[in-house]
Regions:
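Acidic, surface-exposed loops and disordered segments
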Residues: 1-174
Length: 174
């Protein structure tokens, strides 16, 4: 496991300070944990990977805490990937609670990528399979639905269906 240059780690920490939450009133914090210091956090869960660093997002109880956590962490993951780092969300990972009523919500492992990822085309459903009344006439609606169509989903199931109607897009889960 290769350590990240301290200058680059400082850039990552600076970027964390600039993250734009979806719900600013939903208090959260992100800790960067080095692998040798994981005893402090004691990660447990079904899908753990070994990495030189982990990001632990903890949040206070709030109705939008989970949405906010996902929104903020995805910004950070996209930043790390754009800088050549490999990332992995640790599904069902658990960490010790922080002080001050912050509960761990998301853990992401990251580090220098061992090799450049070779992207193969993702198998995605056709637009006509996701929209109940094709064709989508409104150009803005088409762009929004296309973005959702190519977005990742768990096991690439794409469980969403769309119904554009009266300038709105109704979204249903299958």
């Amino acid at each position: 496991m290769t350590a990240i240059d301290p200058h680059i780690m400082k850039q990552i920490n600076c970027f964390i300070q600039t993250l734009a939450p979806l719900h600013p009133q939903a208090a959260y914090r992100i800790a960067v944990v080095e692998a040798y210091n994981t005893q402090k956090h004691v990660f447990k869960g079904m899908f753990l990977v070994q990495a030189p660093y982990y990001l632990v997002l903890s949040a206070k109880d709030h109705p939008f805490a989970a949405v906010n956590a996902g929104y903020v962490m995805e910004q950070l993951v996209l930043y790390l990937v754009s800088k050549g780092f490999a990332t992995c969300y640790l599904g069902d990972a658990k960490s010790k609670p922080d002080l001050d009523q912050y509960q761990p919500m998301i853990v992401v492992a990251f580090g220098k990528a061992a090799a450049t990822a070779v992207k193969k085309p993702a198998s995605r459903k056709k637009l006509t399979e996701l929209v109940n009344q094709p064709p989508v006439a409104q150009q803005n609606a088409r762009k929004i639905i296309e973005a959702a169509r190519i977005a990742p989903s768990a096991f690439n199931l794409q469980p969403w269906r769309f119904m554009p109607q009266d300038g709105k897009i109704h979204i249903f889960m299958t």
